[in-house]
Amino acid sequence: ADQAPENGPVYNVLIQNCHYGTVHGCLTLGSESVKDRNIVLRNIKVDKAQRVLWLKMRPDTPQHYEYVTVDNIQGTTGSFLVIRPWTQFFKPGDRKDMPLSQCNNITMKNIQMDCDNFFDVAKSEKYRLVDFTFEDITCTDTKMAFDASLIENTIAKKVNITPREKSNGLKTTGDADG
């Protein structure tokens, strides 16, 4: 995807004051986007979204997502943050120059959510996760998977995730790729 001329960079995007109903993702970066920078999602109400922030990481395409801010979000979701290898369109070809993909300077703050999985994150040798901030987070979660050690240089301030036994019935990424 990074060698296709139609897949240029995405910079300086502001999404604000929206109300999302049933959607796959409120903000999805990838799988065709390869360089996204300075993206802001703020002042959002979410009703039954499958995911709020979805960072698709293709193992066959170098990607770089940076300076992404998710601020003042409230509502109900399956997964709040999803970062996983995305293999739906996997086409490695004969490529031998695969640079490491990276997500850095990602901030989530002022969040009030009912989630099935707030932190749906998987490590991979294909990408690096660094400099994430979680601040003023209050949510319920059935998976209770938040683990700041999965992301290098994570800052977590006032993060309050409380367990919830019953699922809200929304699909999470662990259920299938998409």
Where are these regions (language model features)?
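Extracellular/periplasmic carbohydrate-active domains that bind, remodel
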Residues: 1-178
